[in-house]
Amino acid sequence: MSELTALTIAEARDKLKAKAITATELTDAYLSAIDSANETINAYVKVTHDQARSMAKASDERIAKGEAGALEGIPLGVKDLFATKGVHTQACSHILDGFKPEYESTVTANLWADGAVMLGKLNMDEFAMGSSNETSYYGSVKNPWRANGSNADLVPGGSSGGSAAAVAAQLCAGATATDTGGSIRQPAAFTGTVGIKPTYGRVSRWGTVAFASSLDQAGPIARDVRDAAILLKSMASLDLKDTTSVDLPIPDYEAAIGKSLKGMKIGIPKEYRVDGMPDEIEELWQKGIQYLKDAGAEIIDISLPNTKYALPAYYIVAPAEASSNLARYDGVRYGLRVPGKDIADMYEQTRAAGFGKEVKRRIMIGTYVLSAGYYDAYYLRAQKVRTLIKKDFEDVFAKGVHAILTPATPSAAFGLADEDLANDPVKMYLNDIFTVTVNMAGLPGIAVPAGINDKGLPLGLQLIGRPFEEETLFQAAHAIEQAAGRFTPAKWW
């Protein structure tokens, strides 16, 4: 970790503006950090050395001319789910072997238009399906954090594990990520970073490989709350190519940071106290409540009665949409093609060889719940539950609550290749217990580091906001960050 790679986005932006450093120096520092660490951490599946250097050179020229954009010269990593023109985009799946898009996703196009530099594509769970970044065709990502005195590798969380690990290990200044049921917030909590899932419709989905279209939303993972605010401002936009994109002004999120919490009402939902929740998570939650109280917020006990149905409903809705979205991968136009006796056999062979175990599992669940005779019993009921979950939140917000504080995850990061979890998918799915409600209701949610456990691992809290009121989340998350401090892993890689 060099002095340059230790800079936050806000610090690097100021130094670039003052011409104390150049974009080329900053980019080279990150590229050399990646080259020395990536073999161990496995955060990147493709490093774009030449492109990064030419983008940095162009940034330096714009800075010299006084034409710097909001992210001029800031080196970022891009989750492998975002289409990047002419650059490896495979959703970390074998079935998309060799795919290089002819177009740029709206999110990445917005970032490059603001002057950001692309370092490369980040590892992730295959098609964003996973909570540990162990389902990637390119192998598992290692969490830069380790327990005190231990050499055991831990997962970085998922599906945006590469994004979170790269940010925590200082292998990029910030990263793009996506969240369908917790894939930004859970890895952020596991790696001591900040991750925000914006309101559904705030950020365009165009050019992002689809998992579950009614739940997917892109957002940033960053080192601190201010950096997350800076990135979201650039990522968000109205996009007529995405029918769910919302035509609302994009606030200056950074301006919300440091504002007083006086008069802010924070709800504490009793239903989030789940059986078997470790003491350290309960203690962290109490600590977070105190931090917000000390910052001037009013704490209110609330009820979200349908919370317990969120996880089973999510694991019906998301696989159903995935089975439909992933039907397009058949080996005909692009990606992997395995020859067969006839066209139907070719489809079958290609999909059998191209998809990993977890993706196949979810496609099968999705196809089953959508099939005749089961559609009403499963899919329709899950959608009704989803409406009830949304109504729970609406009722609470209607009573004047501005944001809701909950744990982000039911534990700290767990071990890599945990056989117990590998053999029991339901146990693995329980990692999403605190995060899926936010996607089901289309709300914004942020994960912010709030403490370190006895083993020296980071723990995160989650704040859930009203639709399109991300500023409130940045404001409250910053208060927690100020009280808890920032956490960086000790370098072992």
Curated annotation (Swiss-Prot):
Recorded coiled-coil stretches: none
One annotated Gene Ontology cellular component of this protein: glutamyl-tRNA(Gln) amidotransferase complex
Keywords of the record: ATP-binding, Ligase, Nucleotide-binding, Protein biosynthesis
Enzyme Commission number(s): 6.3.5.7
Keyword ATP-binding attached: yes
GO MF annotation list: ATP binding; glutaminyl-tRNA synthase (glutamine-hydrolyzing) activity
UniProt cross-references to InterPro entries, sorted A to Z: Amidase, Amidase_CS, Amidase_dom, AS_sf, GatA
PROSITE patterns assigned to the protein according to its UniProt record, in alphabetical order: AMIDASES
List of catalytic residues: K79 (charge relay system), S159 (charge relay system), S183 (acyl-ester intermediate)
Family matches, as NCBIfam families: gatA
Subunit structure: Heterotrimer of A, B and C subunits.
Function, as annotated: Allows the formation of correctly charged Gln-tRNA(Gln) through the transamidation of misacylated Glu-tRNA(Gln) in organisms which lack glutaminyl-tRNA synthetase. The reaction takes place in the presence of glutamine and ATP through an activated gamma-phospho-Glu-tRNA(Gln).
Family, as annotated: Belongs to the amidase family. GatA subfamily.
Protein name: Glutamyl-tRNA(Gln) amidotransferase subunit A
Gene for this chain: gatA
